[in-house]
Each structure stands twice: as C-alpha cells, then as structure tokens.
A protein has these predicted regions:
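Charged regulatory segments coupled to nucleotide-binding catalytic modules in large multidomain enzymes
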Residues: 1, 190, 194, 226-228, ...
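GHKL-type ATPase core
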Residues: 87-208, 213-219
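Short beta-strand element(s) in the Bergerat
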Residues: 56-60, 162
C-alpha cells in the first residue's frame, strides 16, 4: 500500500517564522528559567549560569552536569517542535523551549553536550539568525571541537553535561549601544532580577522538596538560595488543611492539590528582616493569592485568577496549587510556561477551598496589624548571595563582583545623566514593547531630523 499523499507540503519560511517566534513574551529571567527546566529533565543536580559583559562579545552561558546528549539526540533537541515523549514529571511540553527562549534574547544559540567523561567526544551545533537570514533554510551549523572556544569547551573538559551559550545579545543589550556604563548596568539589573526569579520559581527544587531532584543553581559563582513564599520557617505561620480536588478533562483524570497559608502580620514575624524578605519580588499586595506549581516548578506567583480581587486586608493569604503535566490541557499552559487558567469545571470548588484562608487572613490583618510605618529603605527579596554583577573581562571568563554590605539599587545614576539624541532614542526603542516599536521608530526619526546636526543632548 502506498503512503503517498495528494496533499501539498508547505514548509514555513525559516527567517520569517523564527523572527516571529522571538516574540513569544519571554523576558531574560523567564528565558533562563526555561533552559534550567531542560537541565532538570536531563538529571542535573548542579546548574551554573555565567554572564560576561564585553560589549558586542558579551555572552550568557548555562551549564549543567546532567547526562548529556549524543549527536543525534542533540540535533533533535535543536529542532523546532522536537519529537520526544514526556512523562508525568517532565517540565517540558512543546519541544520549543530551548530554541524560543534562547533566541528571544540572542541571535546566536550554541549548544554543546558530552555523555561520557572517559571519551573526549563533544557534540555541538548552533542556530545563527544571521545565517538563517542569508540562506532562509532550517539549518543548524555543526561546531568543530577544535573551534569551540573556552566558553563552551572548559565546562565540558572532564565531565558530562550540556552547555547552552547565548551570543549576539541584541534583545538584552541592543545593537546600537552595547558598550559602556548604561549597558553594563542594564545587564547587572537583569542578573538581580534573574536571581530573584530563579530563587522563587525553583524554590522547591533548591530546598530539596521535589523527590530525587535536589538542585543547586549558581549565578556568576554565587549560590542561589530558595525563597519560600509561605514563610514556613516562621513559628506564627497558619497552615490550613490541604484540599485535593479531582479533575477530569478530555478523558484525562488527575488531582489538584490546594494548600492554603496565612502568613503572620508584621509584628508577629521573627524579625523585621524576615518580614521584608517575605514580601517577595512584587511586594505584599501583588504577592497574595495563588502560587501555581506544575511538577514542582512554579508557573504563577500571586494573583487570584479572577476569583477575587487583591485587597490590602487579604495580603497575608497565599495558596499553593499543584498539579502534574498530564493536566496541562486543562490549565491551558502556554509555550513559555508563564500563563495558566483555572479549569472552568473546578473553579467553584477552588473558590470554596480558598474561602477560609481569605477570611482568616482578613481577620489576622484587621485584628493584629499595627498602623503602617514608613520603611527606611527598599529591600529586594529573596535574599541570597551577593549580587552577581557581570563585568568586562579581557580573559573572557566570568568575573564576579560583590556589592557593599548595605543595599544599593542595581542601577545607580551616573554623575552625568545627559545623553545624545541617538542614545536617548535607542534607549526608548529598547524598552518599548513590540507593538509600540513602529510608532516609536517614526517619532524618534522625526526627532532626529528636527535636531539635525546640532548634536543635542538630553
């Protein structure tokens, strides 16, 4: 019997589709987290994230000590929509994360892997957007072992594992002004945000709460400490009885576990520092609500999923909601694992389950909270190792610089805040959202033409 089809295969244009897939909504922190997911699936127990600032030659590297991949496995992993079977504990879903997350931040993605410490064989390939633009082919480039360079070769000298290297960081630093203090401070700020994000998203792995998956993550050599959104080490924490809800969706049956917590108010925390630490990256009001976990990995931090609105009087209420990847379709998980919807057929049960925690949180706040007092200085949560500042290095090795003991913002004002019109326009374009850029481009073009050759500064 012939397997021939009368259909017409229409292969998408690589350069058009790959450009579009760069805009799925990843920021730097979420993109790094997606690569960490892959490392966890590969059985890694240690993951090192290194960031080097060196202008156009800046790079970001994620290295793990997992089992590594043979050349054929690596080529398949580099494929958009990689074919593989996922089990109930896998963090992956679509076979897109490695590529879409990485190329949302850079123009050149290189991946190298080693499976046997006793053999020198290293498989390495790269996606290069410049090459795709020229050839318009779905074509990865093989990287010869002799030309890998120290950023890729050094971590795999004596161990199994995988190295993911981002170069040509156009979405991180921008093309026009990738040098100088402004670019360095921007990367420093991103490192701080990534540290907070990873400490929160993977806190169950970092604390050893996920069976057989105890994890250590280093950011520029500094160990990331887990941030527990429920302050379970505080003696005055109130942990309500967990609720398990059975869910059936399109023939798939699973369980959704709900664990409600009421955090202590300010005066009942063990210390002022512990209270500030518990406020979270988004601070108290925005951190109330659901913390949704998929296979132990957090995919939502705070918010009530349209069951109720956030309220100052309920800011002490936090609820862990956990499910396995078998229920992904029911929760409508997106590619970037940054959006989730509560299934309509159990929304009423979830609302009933959280009603007690909301009432107790309101009573705790109304009865015991002191009058609000001004906070002396901002504190970023979660606390961890010293801020891993990226710095320029002629030796092409990551350099770690620690801040002073007292907190200071990741980005400090320069002594002269003036900049050229070109620099000003470039900065505006860098922070604009994709749908804003066409309008901003027209405005900045008109601004430059009006300033003309006067070389104005702003």
């Amino acid at each position: 019997m012939s397997n021939q089809s009368n259909g017409h295969e229409l292969i998408p244009s690589p350069k058009r589709l790959m450009k579009s897939l760069r805009d799925l909504g990843y920021d730097f922190s979420a993109a790094v987290a997606d690569i960490v997911d892959n490392s966890i699936e590969a059985g890694a127990t240690s993951i090192a994230i290194d960031v080097e600032f060196d202008g156009d030659d800046s790079w970001v590297r994620i290295t793990d000590n997992g089992k590594g991949m043979e050349p054929a496995q690596l080529r398949e992993a580099m494929r958009y929509g990689a074919e593989r079977d996922y089990d109930d504990e896998d963090l992956g879903r679509f076979g897109l994360g490695l590529k879409t997350a990485s190329l949302s931040q850079c123009q050149r993605l290189s991946v190298a892997s080693r499976t046997n410490p006793d053999r020198a064989n290293i498989a390495a390939y790269c996606w290069d957007m410049e090459h795709i633009e020229k050839t318009n082919k779905w074509e990865i480039l093989p990287l010869e072992r002799t030309g890998l360079g120290p950023a890729i070769h050094n971590p795999l000298k004596e161990a199994t594992g995988t190295v993911v290297l981002w170069q040509k960081l156009d979405r991180i630093l921008g093309f026009k002004h990738p040098y100088g203090e402004f670019a360095r401070k921007k990367l420093t700020s991103m490192c701080r945000e990534a540290e907070e994000h990873l400490a929160m998203v993977f806190h169950r792995f970092l604390a050893g709460e996920v069976p057989r998956r105890k994890l250590k993550i280093l950011l520029n050599g500094n160990s990331i400490k887990p941030w527990d959104p429920f302050s379970r080490d505080e003696p005055k924490i109130k942990e309500l009885t967990p609720v398990v809800i059975k869910l059936e969706h399109e023939g798939v049956t699973g369980s959704v576990k709900i664990e409600p917590f009421v955090l202590p108010n300010q005066k009942n925390y063990s210390s002022a520092e512990a209270f500030k630490r518990a406020s979270g990256p988004a601070k108290w009001n925005r951190q109330q609500g659901f913390y949704i976990y998929r296979a132990g990995r957090m995919i939502q931090s705070g918010g009530w999923c349209r069951l109720r609105t956030s309220d100052e009087h309920t800011k002490l209420a936090r609820v862990a909601l956990s499910f396995l990847p078998a229920l992904d379709e029911a929760f409508k998980i997106n590619v970037a694992k940054m959006q989730v919807q509560l299934p309509a057929n159990i929304r009423d049960q979830i609302e009933k389950a959280i009603d007690p925690v909301v009432k107790i949180a309101r009573k705790t706040y109304d009865k015991e909270s002191p009058a609000p007092a001004p906070v002396a200085s901002p504190v970023t949560s979660p606390p961890s190792a010293p801020v891993p500042y990226p710095k320029a290095s002629n030796a092409r090795q990551p350099v770690v610089s620690s801040p002073p003991a007292s907190y200071r913002p990741a980005v400090e004002p320069a002594s002269d805040n003036r900049c050229t019109i070109d620099e000003f326009c470039s900065r505006i374009e860098e922070i604009a959202k994709p749908d804003e850029r066409p309008v901003i481009a027209r405005v900045t073009k008109r601004l430059k033409s009006q300033v003309g050759s006067r070389g104005g500064r702003t």
